[in-house]
Amino acid sequence: MPRIIKNDSIIDDNWQVLTLAEGDTPESLRLPAEPALVPLAVWLARRDELIATQAPLGVWLDSHEGPEALAADSARFAVIGVNFPKFTDGRSYSNARLLRERYHYVGEIRALGDVLQDQLFYMRRCGIDAYALRGDKDIDKALAGLRVFSETYQAAADQPQPLFRRRIAREAA
């Protein structure tokens, strides 16, 4: 079973990530009985069918897809994946932050695709709390990468108060 990092721990991943192969349509994709992350196109085409299954729901966004399509339904999802098709494509950082801050999504946001240790700390800052690393990377070393920085200066999705405000609050207490 594959493993992921979730909430600063390494766990077994029981979610299957479904993709549309060339020639597949959202309507033709076979849905498994076990928990699955479906592409946004499948969710949009088969929303009622997926809701009726009563199984845990998960959807993933490719980097060129925006989270606004999920705004009304975000509370239905146990997991929303954000895909990083390559290291240099940072649009999914924005998608994660929008999910947390604009759409108030409180479930798991999982980084998928070309996910490397160097990115994890910054992904967390944007609200991502689970990471499916690229297959050739060491998950134990990557977990250590989340602990590189002990303090953050700026406000972000994972820490709404900047450092100077946290210091003032500590001194006042």
Question: PLM ranges: what are they?
Answer:
Residues 126-147:
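Glycine-rich phosphate-binding active-site loops on the catalytic face of alpha/beta enzymes
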Residues 59-61, 67-72, 117-130:
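Catalytic cores of alpha/beta
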Residues 56-99:
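Glycine/Thr-rich beta-alpha phosphate-binding loop at enzyme active sites
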